[in-house]
């Protein structure tokens, strides 16, 4: 799980060159409209049918802030620098895969736009980079295509494009033995059409290692090919769906491991294990090496972890890579301060507690480059998400200092706070408070339930599982603050600033869409704080004030309800809770949002990375 920079942006990872010639045929589904043909054939084309006007594109780009991350890598050894180059190459591959996972026409659109030399074409290409695909977020927080392609369905491109939730549920009900495969974290669902089945079999023949690592897969596909049918659904692991890309990434990760092994054998071990994971789709070996390893100057989040993009089932992970340079002194100081995790777990408002590993690997880093799902200003990450891996090995927390402490980003947060709050509270927010709230948000993912009372994973809640998990983590960061103040971890002023940061987190500049887990859970907290009189709204000024004395109890009570919903695993109860607390009042919320929008110079952020040079994409 992760947190993103800036309290106003959409957690949809679309917030925020030409296509890969080796891209698997299985995901090279071309949907060419007349508009795309114009784009592809006319580098200096005028506006094509179906694409946004220059004014529409400019409205977004005028509100887009470019953040350039340029950490010093001078301290790296020669081998580490070679490893960086190899990992950046893997990141570019993952970027292609991620974009193709999210939209079936993405790479075709990107290739066409990259060839445009006219000003409007370049603007559309920047929009593509901002959104990591051809679907944009408007200033009114609506989503839609800005070129002539179909809108993306909830399942994006990891399910059949025309598959509905009703059809999938019906199929699983009729074929319960297929449930695990059809809901698997790292697999693509397909229709059993003969041409598709033949392509999958051809890839298994091309890469015998995949056949060996996935026993029974070839026999299942061969069986389906003897009686193909569009109405039959089947799933293939990511390593087969993106075979060319994963085999190439496997080789590059091993080359990176070779380069770094003389100076950091533990990081090399992680890279080798993760390379193998990309072909097996079982991340345990890599995650174990990642969590238990003590790396020197580099770290990297590599693979498919987060499920935010899957709006159909909420179970499928999307690819990302985050390459990080370690801030060693800060990391060492932070680790020494984080003690007593079991006491914090036992203090949560539930009768069910688990045994936690006290020594959580936590590090402070500078982002070298992000790709795919990790791109767009992630401030921190706590992984892995799978409960059984966290129970066996714990988790690792990655704090991205050059995003969290970026002065331009914090200025945006401070401006939002000033626009929303009464003047008496103007000085209560600090950058350090955001840092510590983010840290303990990530710890919050580690604490609390990771299984329902019946022993099922939290995905039993369905697509709303991510929303509840993110809310739980938010609330844990605020709930444990009182105990951390008692221990001397926070001063009284720091505690107040942390609470202010928790309020900032809830504020919205537009009404969230129901499918936005981050924004919806923030709105729900805002409404809860209003209901419990932690927040008061002045209709005359459209400003908010805070009663800090009510804060802890309000957080405790909401956390208790969220944990209870997770433990129950009741999809309908969760949806009802979200509907109840996710309401929007145009005068109250709309008034505050209008104040925020009025002072916001920027609404979107486009991240660029010095390490990528001129080849930003």
What are these regions (language model features)?
Residues 48-270:
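N-terminal helix-rich structural modules
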Residues 264, 466-483:
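An active-site-proximal "capping" alpha-helix that borders the catalytic cofactor pocket
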Residues 355, 563-617:
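Extended, compositionally biased alpha-helical segments that mediate assembly or anchoring
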Residues 449-471:
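Post-HEXXH active-site segment of zinc metalloproteases
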Residues 478-574:
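Long, well-structured alpha-helical subdomains associated
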């Amino acid at each position: 799980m992760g947190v993103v920079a800036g309290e106003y942006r959409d957690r949809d990872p679309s917030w925020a060159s030409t296509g890969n010639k080796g891209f698997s045929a299985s995901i090279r589904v071309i949907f060419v409209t007349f508009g795309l043909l114009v784009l592809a054939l006319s580098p200096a084309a005028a506006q094509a049918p179906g694409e946004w006007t220059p004014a529409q594109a400019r409205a977004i780009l005028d509100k887009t802030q470019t953040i350039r991350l340029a950490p010093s890598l001078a301290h790296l050894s020669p081998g580490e620098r070679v490893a960086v180059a190899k990992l950046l190459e893997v990141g570019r591959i993952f970027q292609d895969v991620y974009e193709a996972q999210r939209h079936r026409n993405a790479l075709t659109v990107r290739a066409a736009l990259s060839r445009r030399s006219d000003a409007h074409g370049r603007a559309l290409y920047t929009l593509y980079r901002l959104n990591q695909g051809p679907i944009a977020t408007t200033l009114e927080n609506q989503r839609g295509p800005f070129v002539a392609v179909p809108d993306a369905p909830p399942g994006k491109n990891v399910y059949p494009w025309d598959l509905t939730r009703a059809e999938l549920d019906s199929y699983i009900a009729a074929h319960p033995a297929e449930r695990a495969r059809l809901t698997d974290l790292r697999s693509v669902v397909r229709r059993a059409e003969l041409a598709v089945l033949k392509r999958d079999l051809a890839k298994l023949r091309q890469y015998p290692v995949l056949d060996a690592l996935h026993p029974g897969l070839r026999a299942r596909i061969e069986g389906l090919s003897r009686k193909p049918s569009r109405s039959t659904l089947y799933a293939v692991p990511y390593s087969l769906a993106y075979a060319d890309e994963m085999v190439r990434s496997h080789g590059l990760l091993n080359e990176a491991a070779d380069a770094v092994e003389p100076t950091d054998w533990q990081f090399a071990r992680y890279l080798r294990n993760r390379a193998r994971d990309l072909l097996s789709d079982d991340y345990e070996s890599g995650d174990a090496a990642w969590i238990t390893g003590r790396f020197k100057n580099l770290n990297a989040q590599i693979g498919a972890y987060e499920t935010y993009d899957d709006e159909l089932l909420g179970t499928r992970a999307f690819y990302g890579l985050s390459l990080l340079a370690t801030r060693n002194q800060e990391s060492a100081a932070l680790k020494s301060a984080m003690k007593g995790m079991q006491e914090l777990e036992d203090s949560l408002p539930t009768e069910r507690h688990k045994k936690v590993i006290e020594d959580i690997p936590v590090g402070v880093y500078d982002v070298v480059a992000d790709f795919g799902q990790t791109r767009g200003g992630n401030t921190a990450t706590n992984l892995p998400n799978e409960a059984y891996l966290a129970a066996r090995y714990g988790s690792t927390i990655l704090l991205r200092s050059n995003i969290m402490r970026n002065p331009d980003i914090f200025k945006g947060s401070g401006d939002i706070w000033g626009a929303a709050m009464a003047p008496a509270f103007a000085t209560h927010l600090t950058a350090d408070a955001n840092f510590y709230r983010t840290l303990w948000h990530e710890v919050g993912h580690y604490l609390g339930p990771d299984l329902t009372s019946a022993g099922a994973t939290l995905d039993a809640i369905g697509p709303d599982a991510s929303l509840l998990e993110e809310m739980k983590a938010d609330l844990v960061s605020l709930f444990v603050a009182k105990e951390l103040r008692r221990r001397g971890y926070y001063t009284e002023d720091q505690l107040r600033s942390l609470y202010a940061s928790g309020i900032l987190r809830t504020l919205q500049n537009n009404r969230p869409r129901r499918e936005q887990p981050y924004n919806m859970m923030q709105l729900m907290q805002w409404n809860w704080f209003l209901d419990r009189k932690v927040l008061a709204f002045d209709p005359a000024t459209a400003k908010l004030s805070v009663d800090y004395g009510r804060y802890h109890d309000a957080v405790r009570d909401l956390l208790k309800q969220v944990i209870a919903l997770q433990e129950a695993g009741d999809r309908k109860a969760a949806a009802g809770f979200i509907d109840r607390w996710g309401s929007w009042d145009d005068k109250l919320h709309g008034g505050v949002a209008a104040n925020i929008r009025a002072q916001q110079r920027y609404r979107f952020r486009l991240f660029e990375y010095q390490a990528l040079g001129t080849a930003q994409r």
